[in-house]
Amino acid sequence: MDQKRPQLKARVEGDYGEFVLEPLTRGYGVTIGNPIRRILMSSIPGTAVTSVYIEDVLHEFSTIPGVKEDVIRIILNLKELVVKFHAPGPKTLTLRAQGEGVVKASAFEVPSDAEIVNPDLTIATLAEDGKLVMEVRVEEGEGYVPADKHATKDRINSIPVDAVFSPVRRVAYHVENTRVGQQTDLDRLILRIWTDGSVGPQEALDRAVEILRDELTVFGNVETVSAAAPELPSVYTPAAPIVSGYDLPRQPELSINPQPYPADLDTPRVTLEGLGLTTRVLHSLKEEGIDSVDALCALSDRDLKKVPGIGERSLDEIKQQLAQFGLALRD
């Protein structure tokens, strides 16, 4: 029976998106969901603060007169700053605040080719005599980059900042059973994506699928891969022996020419449990004393239908599992 082509249904609300893909062949829910989740969490490009310069501050363990928060707290607040770029290249945001009040992200002077997505973010709290002057460098990147990996790209006394570039805050997926007509062994993949608002869930998913597709195209380019692959030696050359103070017994040489199975070798033995039958079917067979594959293969369709708990569906299951090992019921 032809399986219906999978359909994608999407529901996006702001920075949250839910995507349902069905029907999928059994097992494909995890096969598709897991790599997409990993790519979403690690490889979607985004922006982050990479360094900050604060006037009269030499290091992150300083305090600023007239400012409630210390420098470490201010840096932690800046890590939550979400900036959306409309053009490539690093951006410098400038902030000058003085006098009592709460300093929000909206106080930053932002270049025309960028915008702050969360302007209500609290940066610091100033007292009446407080003053805060800073420059923040924002860059594009992927994944997580620790502060010590950032080279000093701007002014002296700037403080490097750990950067989490990924615009995807969280990804969750799970797989459910679904059906199409009489076919019930199908998967439904439900994928949930939360972003920081600089990139929408649909855009993030599209980018993840594009990355995965690009990585997999190498498997379709067989001719190029074959031409570029180095020629392997036709004779196995053992590695040089390890020199030590002990005389180790000589190990037998590895044969690189596997011997074929004897022509009269029987089909490999398999236990009844090894057939992969469902617990219910396995229990029904053993209740009737059918406890081996030999005993099972000695029965016909008619014989098995007489076993309590074995109907048409169970009979089909038994035949399918036997066929995987080249076995069959008695005619």
Curated annotation (Swiss-Prot):
Native source organism of the sequence: Deinococcus geothermalis (strain DSM 11300 / CIP 105573 / AG-3a)
Entry EC no(s): 2.7.7.6
A single GO BP: DNA-templated transcription
UniProt comment concerning the protein's domains: The N-terminal domain is essential for RNAP assembly and basal transcription, whereas the C-terminal domain is involved in interaction with transcriptional regulators and with upstream promoter elements.
Top-level lineage group: Bacteria
Complexes and interactors: Homodimer. The RNAP catalytic core consists of 2 alpha, 1 beta, 1 beta' and 1 omega subunit. When a sigma factor is associated with the core the holoenzyme is formed, which can initiate transcription.
Catalytic activity annotation: RNA(n) + a ribonucleoside 5'-triphosphate = RNA(n+1) + diphosphate
Region (Alpha C-terminal domain (alpha-CTD)): 260-331
Molecular functions per Gene Ontology: DNA binding; DNA-directed RNA polymerase activity; protein dimerization activity
Family classification: Belongs to the RNA polymerase alpha chain family.
Region (Alpha N-terminal domain (alpha-NTD)): 1-223
Stored CDD domains: RNAP_alpha_NTD (cd06928)
One cellular component (GO) term of this entry: cytoplasm
Keyword 4Fe-4S in record: no
Enzyme class (EC, first level): transferase
SMART domains registered for this protein in UniProt: RPOLD
Protein name, per record: DNA-directed RNA polymerase subunit alpha
